Amino acid sequence: YDGTDDGMATASFAAGTLSNAMDCMIAVRRDSDANAVCGLYESVSDANKVFGIAESGSGSGCVGSGAGTPTVWVDGVQLTGGTAVTRGTLHTALTVGEYHVLEFRGLDLSTWTASGFGLYTSYVLNGAQGGILLFPSSTPTADRDAARTWLGAKVGLTL
């Protein structure tokens, strides 16, 4: 990553590989105040299978209907809005120039057949990611906490 228009190559897999009870943690840094998808998306042509949309002042949800109704956390703190966190709330929480661990709990990715990061049309991330973890929602709390701490430490955070 050089911090400009970087993305992750799309990973492809069979539908059903992921479940309707998935959690995702991403160490992410926005280097500009521009709107961006800071989470994952299945395809840039499917506006519903996306999560982590950060858009200044927007009252729309930060998770598309094709990704379930997860709760959203930044640096271990749940964002206001429950399972309906807005794009504006996420945009504010992910401060520019700093790494954060962005977390989604309770994603439904059971129909996804691919995933990508950073290059979502019109919402390209100008920044970097320091790691992505995707795991079952049933993961014990102690393991989830250890994963968050490890991911944060990779990018210089103490969580």
Model-identified regions with their sequence ranges:
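Extracellular glycan-recognition modules
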Residues: 1-71, 110-112, 137-148
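Short, aromatic/His-centered strand-loop micro-motif at the edge of beta-sheets
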Residues: 11-12, 65-98
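Extracellular/lumenal carbohydrate-interaction signature centered on repeated Trp-anchored short motifs
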Residues: 12-24, 33, 90-100, 122-128
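A structural signal for beta-strand register positions
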Residues: 27, 101-106, 133
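Short, hydrophobic beta-strand segments that form beta-sheet elements in well-ordered domains
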Residues: 62-65, 100-105, 118-120
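Predominantly extracellular/luminal cell-surface or secreted proteins
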Residues: 73-75, 118, 135-137
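Extracellular glycan-interaction patches encoded by glycine-rich segments
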Residues: 107-130, 138-139
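Extended recognition patches within non-cytosolic domains
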Residues: 131-159
